[in-house]
Amino acid sequence: MNEDRNVEFEATDRKSNVEPENSEVSFLYLSEENMVDAGVLNAARCVDVMEEALGLMEDGDFIMGGPYNDAHGLMLYFPKKSPIENFPVNNSRDRRFIAMPAYLGGRFHVAGEKWYGSNGNNRAKGLPRSILMVMLNDVETGKPLAYMSGNLLSSMRTGAMPGLAAKLLAVKDAKVLSLLGCGVVSKACLMSIMTVRPDIEVIKLKGSSP
């Protein structure tokens, strides 16, 4: 994130981030514009943070949902039809909600959740297929710390993974990059990979549309 506006959460000695004498419950709200100002599109920084997060996961310093603490979220499915008036039904591609809670340790020491809502019919309404929000909570008290737009954050996090893979695994003199898909996530992948392999000379794309 940029130095002018550092919204990263840092824990000190893994203590609560809420002052005990402060009974107010307030939190930071970040719109998509705020997220851009905070540096969410800084692909190199995203790769570095993902490398740090994966190191914490390797150490077991994390918890995800589910009985084995590794579930990729809890999904809300809709039926194909319902006798109940106005009941939501699965009448489009990828209509679902997903709650994705987790705890991450280290200097972050924070709990959070990504709330994912998706409906293939959104395109006709001028909306993205999926709309995401992210909340961070104080892990000791449950107090909300931040509520933020999650679309750019999620795509950049996803793109940072192949960026990190290229950093650690790709041959040092790689000159050609091939991407399957030309959507938002592929753009984020391209941004991240180019930050760690700036000497790439040829980029090949394959999309589903002519």
State where each predicted segment sits:
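N-terminal ligand-binding/catalytic initiation module
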Residues: 2-155, 161-163, 173
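Short acidic/polar capping segments at secondary-structure boundaries
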Residues: 150-153, 182-185, 208-210
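Short internal alpha-helix immediately C-terminal to a glycine-rich phosphate-binding loop
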Residues: 157-178, 184-196
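NAD(P)-binding Rossmann-fold cofactor-contacting core
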Residues: 196-210
